[in-house]
């Protein structure tokens, strides 16, 4: 099936997430890896008329992409920094306060780490930490939670932030899975370390460490992330 080329104006990650995660479709790209306005859907039945099935899938995808396009355009109207204040309404954990408080904590820690290991990036680190969670209040991340960080990077670039700051917003979530990609920039590594350290210290501090059978806040993964980030740096 296919969809309108206008939707290619939406960030690629939004389109592929919609197709792969939500609709279980295969996006189509050209030889250079550029997304094309087509998709492949797989059916476990043999339809009488494949064109009817294709049109049905196109209709469903268009509705999803129309929503994504609306979210993207609406989100762009609010500068990323303006969303930071809204994090006061987002509860990180009842015992650890709001996401705004969490940002305040790990922002200070990130600046201290930068001062010790790479003073030249301290300003970028401070700015990236401030904006790191701002996209949680966006319509797009509200609908597609797996795009947190990715949309933060996009909206930061749209707002005119330095590429190093925008990239650090994305990278601070890495690694997303055990053995996954690690931050490549100093800014992303430092903000990521501070965020993960704050999470681990916070939950241990309120008496909620992982147990042999449960780790609901992925603290082990966060700890492994810290170790791997440190080992990956020169």
Give names to the regions the model predicted:
Residues 1-234:
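Amphipathic alpha-helical "coupling" segments that flank catalytic cores
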